């Protein structure tokens, strides 16, 4: 009987010790970010391009909610600004493809935009789904999933101020091909900035120059998005350097 008691006590102690060693995260988004920033993590981060556009309109709140239920780690969304300076989710310059209205986003006020309904796949107009604001998208994603804001450069000030107001600067990512110094200058006016990832066209001279500027200056971003048309020495060396420096590799698998 004593041996049995000792066995259960030892097992309980092992479980407690194991639990104590597990990192504690405030929310799911924080856990995903920790996996990305851990150079030893083999976790594969899954990013959804404009949300679940097969079942809902792309860049819509239902499309975001759907991928969160699926367990996706990051939502890629696109931003445009209305005539009255409201940031909304839209990939195209016009609303023609994604709503039952017509016109440039920049020529339409937010209230006017709300009179139209969004379209899903096969040009089917929904009964009530509206183009969401960036604020609404942030509210939906906060603490639940990371966000990659595409087409963000022209609206960086508004995006970073909104993210800071909502306590989400560490949850929102933007990417680009600007030089290290240009990125630093763009971010200098702000106390808290968005996460940043360089895009590297490794088969092109400018892409190689940008990548090896990071390497030679010892600057390690959270990840590199590497684009290439041909496999070869350029790509192999790039991937090897990324592994060596402890960063991560972002690959677009849908192309």
Regions found by a protein language model. Name each.
Residues 19-255:
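Phosphate-group recognition and catalysis centered on beta-loop-alpha active-site segments
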Residues 1-29:
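Bacterial Sec-dependent N-terminal signal peptides
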